[in-house]
Amino acid sequence: MNFLSNSVQKIIDKIGNKKYIKQEDIDNIMQEINPALLKADVDYEVVIKFNELIKQQTLNMEILKGLTPQQQVIKIIQNTLTNILGSQPLPLNLKDNKLNIFMLIGMKGSGKTTVAGKLAYFIYKKKIDKILLIAADYHRPGGIQQLQQIGKNINIEVYTNNDTNDASEVILQGINYAKKNNFQTVIIDTTGFSPEDEISVNNLALIKKNIKPDETFIVVDALGGQRISGKIKQINEKLSFTGVIMTKMDAKTSGGLILSIRYITKLAIRFISSSEQHNDDNFEFFYPERIASRILGMGDLSTLIENIENKIDPKQNAELIDKLFQDNYNYYDLQKHLNLIKKMGSFQKILNFIPGIGNKITNLNILDNNIIVKFEAIIQSMTH
């Protein structure tokens, strides 16, 4: 996601130790940034606006005391990215003492069904136990079965009805079932659609009108291309989404579409999702400031610290470190440490959180988590 990291380094080199930023300097800065933005699938309209905002803030700017020219320009770029992305995170609308209904809508292949499971698991980790997934994606072969398997994997009930393929009927039945059985949250996996399919969009709008969900999320593939933003803007006029969930945001995905979606549709990005697994680190609450930092290759220490706190047992880690300094550290202790590292997710993702590192280690073989598996196999093959 750090698609501007190389540009940042070139900006630092070009500005040097100048006391004032002139028009020529701004032009040089944008010559570095614009190609990177376009290559990362940022819409041309957004690139133009980004240029305007940067120029407004940097032209004839006096360098503040305590900052270098490079630091101040990069800070302006980071703040501009943050403002485009939304400035403040928007929390999930979870209410007590009522049934929360979340409706997931997405184009075909967006990863909507996988997101349904991830959102359910995310809410479950918030200590909300009674969650119901409603399988209503009847048009995609295997869609119902996929959600059933996901529900089984994360131990969350899935409502289905094999006697009908009417999505609207099944959704209403599922909600009634949830109310009768005191569920706290319902997550509805709807049928995927094509932007040109007005019938499907109208059907989804009718379903939404009937069930009045608390949240209606549009699930968007981060690899969908620049044109997707305009299509979502049009569809939003009928479906009134409350937010966007971006999928396929893996370490090697540029992520530029996030800027386009946010600026063109004016919809808040609520979550970002990566991988098919239902782990905590594969489904993240969206913090605009943190994402802006990642885009610039400046890391994201706040998220890294949260992951460590959530996944690493501090007592176990302290015991292993004590053994290491007491010269009492053996291969079995190493294996325990490797397991702790695996809980954190992929090496690539961990290192991308560290400022100045993510953009320099993309092609290293050490980033392959299979190396941990190999180490473990070697340790387990050893004799006592």
Region locations from a protein language model:
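Extended, compositionally biased non-globular segments
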Residues: 286-384
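Primarily NTPase-proximal linker/entry elements flanking Walker-type ATP/GTP-binding cores
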Residues: 7-136, 143-163, 170-179, 184-188
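Alpha-helix N-cap/helix-start motif at coil-to-helix transitions, marked by capping-box chemistry
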Residues: 2-6, 24-27, 44-48, 141, ...
